[in-house]
Amino acid sequence: MYLVDTIDYQKICCIIKTFEDNILFQKNYHSTWFLKSIANIQKEKYNYGLEVAFVGYSNSGKSSIINALTNQKKLAKISRTPGRTRLINIFSVTSEIRLVDFPGYGYAQVSRSISKKWKEMIFQYLNIQKCLQGLVIITDIRCPIKEIDELVINLAVSLNIPILLLLNKMDKVTRSIQKSKLFSTREKMLNFSNNINVELFSSFKKIGIHKLQFVLNNWFSSDKKLCQ
């Protein structure tokens, strides 16, 4: 039997398509544009296309990660005062694909009522948004996973929403701490689900961008049904 007879052409075509999709989406991420800011997700939610939401504690670096992903320094405005951003910012990757950036939760200088409102807004969004394809939760690698993070994770798991947990600011710690924190966080996530993806990230050093793009590409893949 010749070697050519053993080639899995279907698998090769699948690999080529995945590669082409990655190239396409990379270009799209770099041309992402700001769509709008909203205060009430229930009144202004979208009923078409696909979305991925970014959530995390204040000062975890959400805006910096979106800027790194899109290769645009000023797309997502970075506030010098953590907790300052109080609106949901929506960015369009294409006419059918969106990134949703929520206000950071839990900052001490924000009143309890506002902090509670933000948490309720996230929980409400996870429950009602049928276009949501995945949730990116961002944490500071130097800080432990907080209670609010666990509440969001629990809700997302119960709703079968895919999760990517990014340990951001990895450049702030040593390699040994990076490995230790990555291992311990992955172990902890097993208490919630076997399908939570945990990765290291540094928006400053631009480390982890390709892994983030790969996960988003999978969530936004062409075989996913568009919300209508």
Swiss-Prot record:
One BP annotation, GO: division septum assembly
Binding site for GTP: 56-63, 83-87, 101-104, 168-171, 201-203
Record GO terms (molecular function): GTP binding; metal ion binding
Gene3D superfamilies for this protein: P-loop containing nucleotide triphosphate hydrolases
GO cellular component labels: cytosol
Domain of life: Bacteria
One Pfam family of this chain: MMR_HSR1
UniProt binding sites for Mg(2+): 63, 85
Family: Belongs to the TRAFAC class TrmE-Era-EngA-EngB-Septin-like GTPase superfamily. EngB GTPase family.
Record's function text: Necessary for normal cell division and for the maintenance of normal septation.
Record NCBIfam families: GTPase_YsxC (TIGR03598)
Name under which the protein is recorded: Probable GTP-binding protein EngB
Gene: engB
